[in-house]
Amino acid sequence: MKAVLIPGDGIGREIAESVREVSAALNTGIEWQEFAAGAEYAAESGELIAPGTLDAIEACGWALKGPTATPIGKGFRSINVQLRQRFSTYANLRPVHTLPGVPTRFDNVDLVIVRENTEDLYKGIEYMLNDEIANGVKLITRPACEKICRFAFDYARKNGRKKVTAVHKANIMKLTDGLFLRTFREVAAEYPEITADDCIIDALCMKLVQKPEQFDVLVAPNLYGDIISDLCAGLVGGLGFAPSANIGDSTRIYEAVHGSAPDIAGQDKANPIAILMAFALMLNDLGETDKAAKLNAAILAQVEEGKVVTADIGGTAGTKEFTQAVIARL
């Protein structure tokens, strides 16, 4: 099968090469179609995404991307925003779990964030009323709420999760977040075997840094989902351990959500774990569950052993050496 690979900026090319090597070692049979995108490509070409990229994604329905930067200034929109809008990837999935061997405050985090990906304040509807007043529109619709809540409960049912928690601020945003919460409760009634509750966003942030193990699946509107995704990544060591999947009806785009780290680009210092875990998510959705499980197990075992790991988790290994160590475990 074919899939699009977008290395992106900075360390992207190095960690994308890790994916290619692991994919070959697992005998996935994936034919990678590589396209350039990001600030570096824009500096060379004046375009943020290489011609043919979007058509290739549409044709095959699968893509994996590294970190991409958006040039500062007018004329460029975020690549992630463009991809979400073009392919209507309405759900952003962020599994977060503790990795033995990565020093953190908690050793029992295992939760999943389901973020609505298409509306809310991120719809980008904002304007100046005059020179001193700016206004932004928080757009929430019942169809989008129902779709993301149903996705969260279906995910919980399929993956043996026991509880889904709605994240909101309906005590203040009574119409917009109120609509989200009402829709969540309506959908929850169709899944009686799954516990459904809700938590106000500010209280949730406090509880996450006190006792994160009390949560299982969190479903949230766009803005809150963005905030808690990074917060939860911090609970397990940072964005270097946080894979992501953007899911639409006919297209799925997987990514490492950390930065492009231009200060270490080209130096064989990058940690490829996030993009390898994103690749494991992709394999799982492709039905290659055994290969996905093998890859995740190899990563966890390598990190837990702690001998051949990258500098950000206390080791001295480079990107290539770490990748080869993971492959050896496969």
Can you say where each PLM-predicted feature lies in the sequence?
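N-terminal beta-loop-helix "entrance" segment that forms/cooperates
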Residues: 30-52, 206-208
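N-terminal glycine-rich phosphate/adenylate-binding segment common to multiple enzyme folds
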Residues: 43-135, 223
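Flexible, glycine/charged-enriched surface loops at secondary-structure junctions
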Residues: 31-33, 159-168, 191-199, 288-294, ...
